[in-house]
Amino acid sequence: MVDSMDMANSSQNTFRRRTMATSEMREFLSTKDAEPNNFGMQTIPESPTPSTPTRRMSIGDSTRIYDWEEPRFNIQGFVVDYFTYRIAQNGLDWYDAPALPDGVQKEHEMMRSLGTIFEKRHMEMFENFSEQLLAVPKISFSLYQEVVQTVGNSSNTPCPMSYGRLIGLISFGGMVAAKMMESAELQGQVRNLLMYTSLFIKTRIRQSWKEHNRSWADFMKLGQQMKEDYEKEKDAEEGKRLKSWSIIGASVIAVIVCGRIIFSFK
């Protein structure tokens, strides 16, 4: 009986240390009021952008088709492609990944580039986040859901699914998926990650992109601009600048994970 209690206390203390050990977490928690206006993507403006040309259906001139409504731009395709790409970066294969009916689009490739840039800019934070998020496998997916909801539903951006937030969510999800694929216990949750991330983003695109004049065509233009800017600045000491997404991201992860882990031992 004593041995069982000692083991439980030891496990609880281990997880508490894991969630509180990162000095950056403690520092960022002191700035809870910070909110990411563009998910750390300073080169992507969040003010309304000019409308871009869209196609019309051959039947009924009054029916407008936005590019984000086209089947080849189904958001699940973006998530599948990025998750597959990110998992491959770790030398692994997502053997049961859903197929892409229309193949890899140039927009998917742009998302790969921007997601990679986003992760590089937040590499240390991402590593700390994933360590804490996956500390207790039985609650990893539910923790991921809470993080996505908390960050994705923040209201301080003009567009609920801004380009920066879109890139950040897919990039973060891809990193978590890659980490899950390394664990036999967590591999089966990658598809759950895919479905949840896709539905979350799809819902918000349909709710906001029309009103805020967002489109994949505009995403491509701004994405190219960001890539060019990144090439110019990648040798600069970016680490000296504190990113707003990192601030709220660290706060969200630390609070949610620490609370849930402690609760799981009660």
UniProtKB/Swiss-Prot annotation:
Motif BH1 in this chain: 156-174
Region span, Disordered: 1-58
Compartment(s) where it occurs, according to its Swiss-Prot or TrEMBL record: Perikaryon; Synapse; Endomembrane system; Mitochondrion membrane
Topological category with respect to the lipid bilayer: Peripheral membrane protein
PROSITE patterns according to UniProt: BCL2_FAMILY, BH1, BH4_2
Molecular function per GO: channel activity
UniProt feature, compositional bias: Basic and acidic residues: 24-35
Motif (BH4): 75-94
GO-annotated cellular components: endomembrane system; mitochondrial outer membrane; perikaryon; synapse
Predominant localisation class: other
InterPro entries per record: Bcl-2-like_sf, Bcl-2_BH1-3, Bcl-2_fam, Bcl2-like, Bcl2_BH1_motif_CS, Bcl2_BH4
A single GO BP: positive regulation of apoptotic process
Keyword annotations from UniProtKB, A to Z: Apoptosis, Membrane, Mitochondrion, Synapse
Motif BH2: chain residues: 208-223
Function noted in UniProt: Plays a major role in programmed cell death (PCD, apoptosis). egl-1 binds to and directly inhibits the activity of ced-9, releasing the cell death activator ced-4 from a ced-9/ced-4 containing protein complex and allowing ced-4 to activate the cell-killing caspase ced-3. During larval development, required for the elimination of transient presynaptic components downstream of egl-1 and upstream of ced-4 and ced-3 apoptotic pathway.
UniProt cross-references to PANTHER family, sorted A to Z: APOPTOSIS REGULATOR CED-9, BCL-2 RELATED
Protein family per UniProt: Belongs to the Bcl-2 family.
Subunit description: Interacts with asymmetric homodimer ced-4; the interaction sequesters ced-4. Interacts with egl-1; the interaction results in ced-4 release. Interacts with dre-1; the interaction inhibits ced-9 activity, either directly or indirectly. Interacts with dct-1. May form a complex composed of ced-9, ced-4 and mac-1.
Name of the protein: Apoptosis regulator ced-9
Native source organism of the sequence: Caenorhabditis briggsae
Gene responsible for this protein: ced-9
